[in-house]
């Protein structure tokens, strides 16, 4: 599936948020790219809405058409559209692998999923956008357990913070999905209501 593969630090600086997670280059220069990191001009309501959409889209690594599809699905569900949207994004398999501490970044997690290293409820899944649900069990496939990324993940897992809606068992390279995440458990710095306003005007 198509995805953005360009420089993420520049995107992070432009949007004012670390899109990678632990991006030291962004931490050194957390201001917009350009000469001397000049200050932002006053942004219109539309630009503020667009920026929030782009933050979410690039954080989860999805292209515009797919992101719009997530919004459409979120708007059909009961509850707040913004909360539903973030829940759909959080429940992508690649994001769950990242959140569980089994990959360095979401981009790395996407690669591991695409290469077929994971099973969901005992069945191989190689689609990064696969939606996990409550009570799903995600395992690294047995033949992949001794690959370097997973050895490193086991050895360094104590450094990662796993959200409460998931349980990671690094000794078995297993993730248990206890529940679907609620907004308070999703720690990305995005104002989802601005995303809803952006699409509601389309």
From Swiss-Prot:
GO terms for biological process: ribosomal small subunit biogenesis; translation. It comes from the Bacteria. GO terms for molecular function: rRNA binding; structural constituent of ribosome. Residues 91-157 form the S4 RNA-binding domain. The keyword Ion transport does not apply. PANTHER family: 30S 40S RIBOSOMAL PROTEIN, SMALL RIBOSOMAL SUBUNIT PROTEIN US4M. One of the primary rRNA binding proteins, it binds directly to 16S rRNA where it nucleates assembly of the body of the 30S subunit. Belongs to the universal ribosomal protein uS4 family. This is Small ribosomal subunit protein uS4.
């Amino acid at each position: 599936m198509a995805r953005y593969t360009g420089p993420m630090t520049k995107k992070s600086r432009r949007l004012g948020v670390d899109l990678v997670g632990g991006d030291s280059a962004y931490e050194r220069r957390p201001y917009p790219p350009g000469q001397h990191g000049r200050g932002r001009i006053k942004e219109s309501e539309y630009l503020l809405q667009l920026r929030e959409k782009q933050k979410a889209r690039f954080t989860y690594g999805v292209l515009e058409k797919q992101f719009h599809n997530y919004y459409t699905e979120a708007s059909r569900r009961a509850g707040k559209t913004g909360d539903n949207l973030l829940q759909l994004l959080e429940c992508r398999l690649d994001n769950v692998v990242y959140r569980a501490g089994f990959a360095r970044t979401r981009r790395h997690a996407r690669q591991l999923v695409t290469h077929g290293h994971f099973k969901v409820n005992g069945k191989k899944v190689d689609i990064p956008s696969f939606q996990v649900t409550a009570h799903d069990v995600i395992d690294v496939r047995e033949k992949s357990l001794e690959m370097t990324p997973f050895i490193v993940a086991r050895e360094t897992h104590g450094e990662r913070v796993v959200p409460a809606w998931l349980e990671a068992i690094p000794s078995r390279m297993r993730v248990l999905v206890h529940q679907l995440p609620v907004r308070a458990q999703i720690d990305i710095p995005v104002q989802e209501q601005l995303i809803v306003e952006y699409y509601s005007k389309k």
